[in-house]
């Protein structure tokens, strides 16, 4: 593989330390790097920059991305030297900082927004106080849910307990039946890999109607005031349960870990998912870019 190294468990501490120096892009978080490892993921480092070869969430093939600052150009040049018969290098999910460091480089053929992969960022205070215009209508829907189902409750559940894992998998499978989802296997396998990761710091909140588990969210607090909202499913016979889950989770993450922002991941170009995430009223998005590089103009 030349310059590339397989991402192994012992690499995750180093990769997480590097990612912590940058904005919290979900695809470069160690949970994503490990859980969505459909085949092997790869990386190499030059100076302050790491270049990755990762599995695409939806397409299933490998793509190249990076995270870095001043050493982005030499890292790309090193990447190009490892490739044969390549006139153009295409990078996906390039973070804003890296894009700014190369956008005036003569080797750049094109730069465009990677719209299917922008991260949705939410202000936690607005989520739990319903203070934005979009959020105010959500409060009414949640009240209706709780009035109709007064025995709904939530609790933090232990992901190392096999009984809890079985309940989570059952909710996911029920969601497949309710939605008719076809492309669910990658997410399901990623869910199972993430849950089994040792020392992952994942927080799972289970939602119950009396004793019956009807939903869950799986999240991870980060040191920069964010938390990553990785996985979540709900029984769709409970109208607005997913909204309630986000509200309860945001409140818990703020009270317990002091989180100020939630990263609700990209929409992967799925229209229904895009509509849902926009309906929640994101405060901003962490933008990502597709960058094409002319190898002949590298210097």
Q: Where in the sequence are the language-model features?
A:
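Short Lys/Arg-enriched alpha/beta "domain-start" segment
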Residues: 3-33
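Conserved donor-binding loop and adjoining core beta-sheet/short helix segment
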Residues: 23, 27-97, 208-236
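Short, glycine/charge-rich beta-strand/loop segments that flank catalytic centers
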Residues: 88-104, 116-119
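Short catalytic-loop micro-motif centered on adjacent basic/acidic residues
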Residues: 90-92, 155, 260-264
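Short, aromatic/basic amphipathic alpha-helical patches
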Residues: 99-110, 276-277
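Acyltransferase donor/substrate-recognition loop-hinge adjacent to the catalytic core
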Residues: 107-181
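Short, conserved active-site entrance elements at the starts or edges of catalytic domains
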Residues: 160-212
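Aromatic (often tryptophan-rich) hydrophobic motifs at membrane interfaces
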Residues: 201-295
């Amino acid at each position: 593989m030349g310059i590339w190294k397989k991402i192994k468990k012992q690499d995750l501490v180093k990769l997480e330390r590097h990612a912590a120096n940058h904005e919290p892009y979900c695809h470069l978080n160690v949970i994503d790097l490990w859980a969505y490892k459909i085949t092997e993921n790869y990386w190499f480092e030059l100076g302050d920059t790491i270049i990755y070869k990762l599995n695409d969430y939806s397409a299933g093939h490998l793509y190249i991305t990076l995270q870095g600052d001043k050493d982005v150009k030499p890292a790309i040049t090193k990447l190009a030297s490892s490739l044969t018969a390549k006139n153009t290098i295409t990078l996906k999910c390039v973070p804003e900082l890296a894009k700014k460091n190369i956008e005036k480089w003569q080797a750049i053929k094109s730069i465009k927004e990677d719209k299917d992969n922008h991260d949705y960022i939410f202000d936690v205070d607005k989520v739990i106080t319903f203070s934005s215009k979009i959020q105010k209508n959500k409060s009414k829907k949640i009240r209706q849910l709780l009035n109709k189902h007064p025995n709904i409750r939530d609790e933090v559940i232990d992901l190392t307990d096999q009984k809890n894992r079985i309940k989570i998998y059952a909710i996911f499978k029920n969601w497949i039946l309710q939605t008719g989802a076809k492309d669910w296997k990658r997410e399901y396998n990623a869910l199972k890999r993430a849950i089994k990761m040792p020392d992952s710091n994942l927080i799972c909140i289970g939602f119950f109607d009396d004793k019956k588990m009807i939903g869950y969210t799986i999240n991870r607090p980060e040191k920069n005031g964010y938390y990553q909202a990785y996985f979540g499913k709900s029984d769709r016979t409970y109208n607005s349960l997913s909204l309630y889950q986000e509200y309860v989770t945001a409140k818990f993450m703020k009270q317990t870990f002091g989180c100020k922002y939630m990263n609700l991941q990209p929409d992967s170009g799925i229209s229904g998912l895009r509509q849902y995430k926009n309906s929640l009223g994101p405060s901003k998005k962490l933008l990502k870019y597709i960058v094409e590089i002319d190898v002949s103009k590298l210097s």
